[in-house]
A protein has these predicted regions:
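Hydrophobic structural segments
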Residues: 1-314
Length: 314
């Protein structure tokens, strides 16, 4: 889907986060009008019906893993019943939106505050995979080009990244095989090239498809390895540098003005601020990441009193 390409669901900040299509119909259902909302409420559903929208794109999920039944006896069940009866689909973006490197919640905050050298505060692990494939020497370049064109081989600001090593490959087809090289039931040995590339896991299926299409073998030998590397762009929160150092008081006034909020809660630590970490929503889970990043200030939407007090005395 177009939404899935813009906000890959596998980039969600939590592996089991409730993102994607929560209420939907067949793939052939024509979506004519969409309504965007922060969360699904009675008013939002009523507005969707009134304006003729058959898709709601919501930030917050309506369905969570512990849902066991749909009845009018619960608020969630009543809302789901209305959506289904009125043929309204529901698509949730939640942390897939938060983690987006271009327009995620925290990235928008960082841009509004004028940060330079913006990076993810907590790069997300598990979003990268490594594809390894073995190809005849004469085809190695063709296979590489196909994989690059399909989206493999990107590492931060570099593309067409790969590693190759030559070796000796062996195989023997059974009686039903139709090998490109060699004869069934006869062991073959030939020079092959091992090709390795990193790929974002939501691109892996199309890279494999392009790789197999470019390969001459009847059965293509390849491996896909999960990586724990943090993604250089996708992550929770943002951290960046101010154009010039300023005192806590001056910076807080800027924050109030930029975000149009009448009040801020500040823990009273007065210091020169040059580097700032931000995370929309409840961000104390990433407080340690903010400290590790070297940030002088951490801005987030919700903090428990004891955590707020602890941060002032760390």
């Amino acid at each position: 889907t177009a939404l899935g390409k813009t906000l890959p669901l596998r980039s969600a900040g939590y592996e089991k986060d409730a993102v994607g299509l929560q209420v939907g119909f067949t793939k052939d259902t024509e979506l004519t009008k969409a309504l965007v909302a922060y969360e699904v409420t009675d008013d939002v559903v009523a507005e969707s019906i009134a304006v003729g929208a058959n898709l709601i794109i919501s930030y917050h999920p309506l369905i969570f893993p512990n849902l066991s039944s749909i009845t009018d006896a619960t608020r969630t069940g009543a809302l789901l019943t209305k959506l289904i009866k009125n043929d309204i689909a529901l698509y949730v973006v939640h942390t897939a939106f938060d983690a987006n490197p271009e327009f995620g919640t925290s990235r928008l905050m960082a841009d509004a505050l004028g940060f330079a050298n913006i990076k993810p505060l907590a790069p997300l692990p598990g979003l990268l995979e490594k594809i390894v494939v073995f190809a005849p020497e004469a085809e190695a370049k063709t296979v590489q080009e196909a994989m690059w064109s399909a989206g493999a081989g990107y590492i931060s600001n570099y593309d067409e990244c790969s590693f190759t090593i030559e070796g000796q490959g062996t195989f023997r087809g059974n009686a039903a095989s139709n090998p490109t090289i060699g004869t069934p039931l006869v062991r073959e040995s030939l020079r092959e090239v091992r090709i390795e590339m990193i790929v974002e896991k939501w691109k892996t299926p199309r890279v494999i498809s392009a790789m197999i299409e470019a390969h001459s073998y009847e059965e293509v030998a390849y491996d896909v390895y999960p990586l724990t590397n943090g993604h250089p762009h996708y992550g929770m929160g943002s951290v960046g540098e101010l154009s010039m150092p300023m005192t806590s008081g001056v910076f807080m006034k800027d924050v109030k003005r930029i975000f149009g909020t009448p009040t801020l809660r500040h823990n009273g630590v007065e210091k020169s601020i040059s580097k700032v970490a931000v995370l929309g929503g409840s961000g104390m889970e990433y407080y340690s990441a903010a400290r590790t990043s070297g940030a002088d200030c951490f801005i987030t939407g919700d903090i428990r009193y004891h955590d707020f007090y602890r941060a002032a005395h760390d």
